[in-house]
């Protein structure tokens, strides 16, 4: 069957949940396709989501890193969702709360069967911090593809930007095809077509294609 193009501008807020256990209570089971967005609290995750969906306030931006504690879910259609995970690595938050959030992130990556890809967002000026690597390792260990998205690329000159992109690609080369690395600017739109192409591919995992093919053949 022909792969359809997903219109990410149609994303709409579905639910918020405090952790993965509560997420299961709100969603129609561990079904469909989910793409998760994860990153440090200052990585520009909300701005990236808003830019990719062309909606100024789909994901709330905050001047206070770590304020967004909830898992926020946005619906693309009846089978596909975007999941905005809590920011990690924030400084002005109690240690117990940090540990709780990081545990929830790990549980989500390891237990959510419908997860077809994870976007790990990193400020291009400060990539590959310990928690970024942990998120990437968790995802790849669960055989979930990762897009390492280097945000705020407009902050660097072209030569410095490509130097950092190449350095990050080299650092993540051992993960093979499981990890892609791309620069991105929510402000300038740099990298947006490439990112949307990757997300669209993740929205059509092989199991879903097989399921839809079977449904077509039975009609």
Curated annotation (Swiss-Prot):
Any one cellular-component term (Gene Ontology): cytosol
Alphabetical list of InterPro entries matching this protein: G_ENGB_dom, GTP-bd, GTP-bd_ribosome_bio_YsxC, P-loop_NTPase
Residues the record lists as binding GTP: 39-46, 66-70, 84-87, 151-154, 184-186
Alphabetized PROSITE patterns for the sequence: G_ENGB
GO biological process: division septum assembly
Pfam families, sorted: MMR_HSR1
Molecular-function annotations in GO: GTP binding; metal ion binding
SUPFAM superfamilies, per database record: P-loop containing nucleoside triphosphate hydrolases
Cofactor(s) required, per the database record: Mg(2+)
Binding positions for Mg(2+) per the UniProt entry: 46, 68
CDD domains per the UniProt record, alphabetical: YihA_EngB (cd01876)
Entry similarity comment: Belongs to the TRAFAC class TrmE-Era-EngA-EngB-Septin-like GTPase superfamily. EngB GTPase family.
PANTHER family for the chain: ENGB-TYPE G DOMAIN-CONTAINING PROTEIN, MSS1/TRME-RELATED GTP-BINDING PROTEIN
NCBIfam families: GTPase_YsxC
Role of this protein: Necessary for normal cell division and for the maintenance of normal septation.
Name under which the protein is recorded: Probable GTP-binding protein EngB
Primary gene name: engB
């Amino acid at each position: 069957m022909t792969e359809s193009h997903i219109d990410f501008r149609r994303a709409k807020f579905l639910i918020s949940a405090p952790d993965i256990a509560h997420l299961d209570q709100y969603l129609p089971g561990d079904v469909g396709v989910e793409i998760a967005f994860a990153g440090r609290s200052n990585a520009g995750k909300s701005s990236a989501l808003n830019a990719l969906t062309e909606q100024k306030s789909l994901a709330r931006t905050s001047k206070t890193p770590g304020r967004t504690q909830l898992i926020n879910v946005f619906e693309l259609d009846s089978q596909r969702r975007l999941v905005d995970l809590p920011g990690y690595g924030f400084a002005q938050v109690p240690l117990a709360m940090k540990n709780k959030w990081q545990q929830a992130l790990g549980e989500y990556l390891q237990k959510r069967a419908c997860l077809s890809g994870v976007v790990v967002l990193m400020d291009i000026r400060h990539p590959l911090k310990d928690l970024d690597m942990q998120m990437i390792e968790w995802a790849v260990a669960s055989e979930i593809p990762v897009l390492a998205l280097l945000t705020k690329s407009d902050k660097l000159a072209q030569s410095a930007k490509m130097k950092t992109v190449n350095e990050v690609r080299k650092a993540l080369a051992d993960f093979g095809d499981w990890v892609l690395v791309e620069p991105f600017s929510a402000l300038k739109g740099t990298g947006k077509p490439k990112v949307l192409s990757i997300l669209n591919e993740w929205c059509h995992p092989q199991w879903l294609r097989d399921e839809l093919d079977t449904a077509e053949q039975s009609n």
